[in-house]
Amino acid sequence: ESRGLGDVYKRQENKELISNISHDLKTPITAIKGYVEGIMDGVADTPEKMDRYIRTIYNKANEMNLLINELTLYSKIDTNRIPYNFTTISAKGYFGDCAEDLSVELESKGAEFTYRNFMDDDCKVIVDPEQLRRVINNIVSNSLKYTDKPKVEITMDVKDVGDFIQIELGDNGRGIAAKDLPFIFDRFYRADASRNSSKGGSGIGLSIVKKIVEEHGGNIWATSEEGVGTTMYFVIRKYQEVPVNE
């Protein structure tokens, strides 16, 4: 019986995925088609208009590419085929580099970014640098998507919590309703889907984030207040050398 229910849930998940993907691919395709038709009909009759049309087409194609990449990664996650390349690195140096990249990106989008690192210089972690950066970028991307205030504020704090390092990524966005908060890391879940559908997104981004954090031996959770903002927390274990008995 439990297997039967599992199959039902799986089919429901797949239906939701197909519905979300259909919507999210259709939106940029419709825009691309419209702008291409405009060029063909001679509407873009000045260099400025032509430049604007081509840039819009390029941006919409990028949106589609990002979605397809997310789906490919999800497929690998679902079959446990993500290739991890773990390495031992300085926590302060690694998260400092991540913050520097974020700072440049957020500044270009007019967002305010604050970074604080409370780790000792000699603290190390075993991580896959590329996959963990995906976690941070995905969370920040989500924050930008669901923040509708004139001044977007993003914070990143890295803290020492015993055997673990805790990373906190906060925003001043619209927040998540208490009823939705327990489910935001579930596959295909979109809080208040009717409102958020205009923002796109397949609803698999945070499930990917959760999987990567757990594969690092950590866990992830969130706190949120509607109208005030959301903070995502995740912890990963510190690297500790095991003394060798002589």
Describe every region a protein language model picked out.
Residues 79-84, 124-127:
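Conserved micro-motifs of the catalytic ATP-binding
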Residues 176-190:
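Short conserved segment of the HATPase_c
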Residues 59-64:
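Short alpha-helical segment of the dimerization/phosphotransfer core of two-component systems
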Residues 1-9:
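Single conserved hydrophobic/aromatic residue that forms the stacking wall/gate
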Residues 217-218:
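Conserved glycine-rich
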Residues 143-144:
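Short helix-loop "hinge" at the ATP-lid/N-box region of the Bergerat-fold HATPase_c
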Residues 85-89, 107, 112-123:
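Conserved catalytic submotifs in the C-terminal HATPase_c
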